[in-house]
Amino acid sequence: SDSAKVEKLFQWTVQNIQPTPDDWSVVDDHILNIIIRGHGVADQRADVFTTLATYSGVPAFWVSLPKHSDAQILLSFVFVDDRWVVADVANGFQFRNSEGELATLDELVAQPARLKMYAAERTVIKDVSYAKVFSGLTMPKPQSPLRAELQMPLKRLIYEARAMLSLGTNDESD
């Protein structure tokens, strides 16, 4: 199932792509090199996970939320069973709802106690608790085509042709 596939890809990413140590330089690179190196910063680790999911046939993307805030959470969204479920690769959180299924952002925002099971008060972003940063978040609109799809030859060709002919790309990313 897509859910099982996503769970395995998430676990593989968390186990095999470690956080880049603070005293190492950050290399902005292709995900293949990040996989070979075995480490990356938060957005690189999320990019590995969402690209692997997309290549395996499960659409996925990552984004920092809330937009235009100093305290942001980098979240990954994966389309499983006709809904966008959410994960936090950097913190190793693959969220589940009260039924034990992979959770959507709306489910987590509606159940702050469940979110606190994952992120204790010790988890902070720029001196703001994880739960507080998470509260009030809304599902972002997925980029189209997805970032990982732009690495697929045919999708990239179509994207570039649409851009060149000013037909629009539906790319609302910052």
What spans do the regions from the language model cover?
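Cysteine-centered nucleophilic/redox motifs
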Residues: 9, 34-64, 76
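Sec-exported extracytoplasmic/periplasmic mature domains
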Residues: 11-19, 51-58, 81, 110-113
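Secondary-structure boundary elements
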Residues: 1-37
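Short, surface-exposed recognition loops or helix-turn segments adjacent to catalytic cores
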Residues: 26-28, 62-67
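His-Asp-centered catalytic microenvironments across diverse enzyme cores
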Residues: 68-70, 78-174
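Short, solvent-exposed loop/turn and secondary-structure capping segments
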Residues: 20-25, 46, 73, 87-90
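Extracytoplasmic/periplasmic, Sec-exported soluble proteins
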Residues: 1-5, 34-45, 68, 97-100, ...
